[in-house]
Amino acid sequence: MSLFDWFADRRKGQFVGKVTQESEESDGLWEKCPECGQVVYRKDLIDNCSVCSNCGHHNRIDSKERIRIISDPNTFKSINNNLTPVDPLGFKDRRAYADRLRESQASTGLKDGVLTGTCEVNSIPMALAVMDFRFMGGSMGSVVGEKITRLIEHSTKEKLPLLIVCASGGARMQEGMLSLMQMAKISGALERHRDAQLLYMPLLTHPTTGGVTASFAMLGDLILAEPKALIGFAGRRVIEQTLREKLPDNFQTAEYLQDHGFVDTIVPRTELKETLAKILRLHKTQEVKLQTNA
């Protein structure tokens, strides 16, 4: 084989390899970690709860995948997920609110930004709400607030512990005051849940901001968070411009909030189900003791 032929074969092999790699990536077989750049086999990533095995980066996941990770197989029962948002103000900015709703519904397959229902975690029953950031940034409108409130009332009536997985940009501006009212409505329902001596845990995921942080995300008996999740009310630049100070690099992260007493524990996604099961078992044991002493 001549030197020219050898180089030709090398170029051909590289080209075929490149085409094959691009084809596999286009088929969704591989994913690149946005944090460390490691290329991971997609099935392995899903099996690891969409957490990078190299650096521990928690990739964003949708509400249905979150339910699959948290609950026992085939135990999730949907509640009130037929509610659909409307456009009470006829709101329009660059685009009409009604158009944004239709687009989000088509792209996500959801009616609004939260799924609610009951499930079992290691055979222990629990009420569960999971916000979905894909739907208009997980913003809280009247339907999101109503669904969460109804779930809290259901869990109070059935004496169930409650977990709300938060992932939101805050109140939905397109619904004006109606969206802000959800903060008080949900908080009131949680107070009645607390009066019934029932357990409520919010799980703060990336990102949890705005009116959600200012209401039910911070009202838990135990406040859980995922590693490196962005958690805050106003944006970093707004705070810096208001205070005229440079904020720490880790400001508004789960780790920063835990250090300052706003988060009880940070739970990696791969350990979440077992951690929840342990907390639920302890709470159930304590309930039995209280009933026995009464």
Swiss-Prot record:
Residue positions binding Zn(2+): 33, 36, 52, 55
Keywords, ordered alphabetically: ATP-binding, Cytoplasm, Fatty acid biosynthesis, Fatty acid metabolism, Lipid biosynthesis, Lipid metabolism, Metal-binding, Nucleotide-binding, Transferase, Zinc, Zinc-finger
NCBIfam families recorded: accD
Places the protein is found: Cytoplasm
GO annotation terms (biological process): fatty acid biosynthetic process; malonyl-CoA biosynthetic process
Annotated protein name in UniProt: Acetyl-coenzyme A carboxylase carboxyl transferase subunit beta
UniProt keyword Nucleotide-binding present: yes
Bound cofactor: record note: Binds 1 zinc ion per subunit.
Gene: accD
One annotated Gene Ontology cellular component of this protein: acetyl-CoA carboxylase complex
Known role: Component of the acetyl coenzyme A carboxylase (ACC) complex. Biotin carboxylase (BC) catalyzes the carboxylation of biotin on its carrier protein (BCCP) and then the CO(2) group is transferred by the transcarboxylase to acetyl-CoA to form malonyl-CoA.
Annotated GO MF terms: acetyl-CoA carboxylase activity; ATP binding; carboxyl- or carbamoyltransferase activity; zinc ion binding
Major enzyme class: transferase
Record EC number: 2.1.3.15
Names of required cofactors: Zn(2+)
Protein family according to the UniProt entry: Belongs to the AccD/PCCB family.
Subunit structure: Acetyl-CoA carboxylase is a heterohexamer composed of biotin carboxyl carrier protein (AccB), biotin carboxylase (AccC) and two subunits each of ACCase subunit alpha (AccA) and ACCase subunit beta (AccD).
Stretches assigned to the CoA carboxyltransferase N-terminal domain: 29-294
Xref: Gene3D superfamilies: 2-enoyl-CoA Hydratase, Chain A, domain 1
Species of the source: Prochlorococcus marinus (strain NATL1A)
Annotated pathway: Lipid metabolism; malonyl-CoA biosynthesis; malonyl-CoA from acetyl-CoA: step 1/1
Zinc finger annotations (C4-type) as residue ranges: 33-55
Signal peptide location: none
